[in-house]
Amino acid sequence: MTDVLPGSHAGTPEPELRLVLLGTIGCGKTLSGDTLLGQASSGSPFASGSSPRLCQLRRGASEGRRLTVVEAPRWYWNGGHMEAGVRKETERALELASPGPHAFLLLVPVGQFTEVERRVPTELEEVFGEGVLKHTLVLFTCGDYLMGRGAGQYLEGEDPGLREVIDRCGGQYHVINNRRPQEREQVRELLEKVTMTTIPSYNGNDNNGSN
């Protein structure tokens, strides 16, 4: 008997999405992975030999899709650039999301945009190639901090640099509240945005996508 994911139909191959979560310290990558997959991670990210300086790979099923979620290492900066060791490990995310991620999710906590985040799009192009921003969506975490405001209203009062980052990522953004992981509509909407705006997957060569 073939297992069928919730919300899917027997005989239909389940669509797969491969996502890479990127961001600085404290942006909420692990919690966002929990929310996306609808499951809690197994213990502390420091447990079982894991390290915040290494990529973490998780797989599961969510909202009728098979998900591969790669959590890139915490970003540490040396002057104006990412540390060499962290950059090398970040590059490994492409391998873990083989044949290539469908989207890079750039996590930015609500109300915590800094000069570091302003530099990230350029850094991503240096790490993954010029085509990466076409496959990047800004994911605002700590959505509860909006206190009922819409994302558009929030952006109007923020540093113009945040809008610039979003524009460089094709204008794509989404808000997630990891304090309410049971609200699955926020996950469905995010996965739909990824499906509509970033397919095919990215393998480091913008002229050679895969499925």
Could you describe each region identified by the protein language model?
Residues 42-44, 66-89, 120-121:
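Switch II (G3) loop of P-loop NTPases
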Residues 1-4, 181, 195-211:
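Conserved P-loop small GTPase signature centered on TRAFAC-class small GTPases
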Residues 1-24, 56, 91, 205-207:
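Short, flexible boundary segments at extreme N-termini or domain junctions of P-loop NTPases and their
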Residues 24-27, 63, 67, 74-75, ...:
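Conserved beta-strand elements of beta-rich interaction domains across eukaryotes
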Residues 88-168:
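Conserved C-terminal guanine-recognition region of P-loop GTPase G domains, centered on the G4
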Residues 38-66, 89:
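Switch I (effector-binding) loop of TRAFAC-class P-loop GTPase G-domains
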Residues 148-200:
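Canonical P-loop GTPase G-domain recognition
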Residues 17-44:
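Glycine-rich phosphate-binding P-loop
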